[in-house]
């Protein structure tokens, strides 16, 4: 048996040439459509990567803000400074430098409350009052006792005092 020679017949030659041209054209069509779809996918992935990057930046910004707010809240919940005010110094004719010296002396006595949290200072406010009131202060070689009139506990501890002669 012999296989017929198709390459000599022009009908078969056109058929095979058409198949080859069709295969080449369909291959180019496949490459074009595949490339188009891949280009769309790549652009979609790039958009998603950019969106994820933006979201990560937002997350980091929010985390930084949250961290700063937490630090501020921690700082706000601590006693940061002490303020002492003498209310009736004029009644005893105490000069301004002596008033300032007295206020500084009281500040030194209660300065350990700085950097303590407000809640613990509030719980020990009676002890703080007694610490101030039980001490005898010397101003111009005269002995004075202090009475706490007002004690404000916040980020700044404010103490308003009245003095009287010690007995």
Swiss-Prot record:
Membrane topology of this protein: Single-pass membrane protein
UniProt-annotated location(s): Cell membrane
Superkingdom of the source species: Bacteria
Alphabetical UniProt keywords: Cell membrane, Membrane, Transmembrane, Transmembrane helix
Transmembrane region(s): 15-35
A GO CC annotation given for this chain: plasma membrane
Induction conditions: Expression requires the sigma-E factor SigE.
Primary location: membrane
Biological function: Involved in sporulation.
Protein name from the UniProt record: Sporulation membrane protein YtrI
Taxonomic lineage: Bacteria, Bacillati, Bacillota, Bacilli, Bacillales
Gene: ytrI
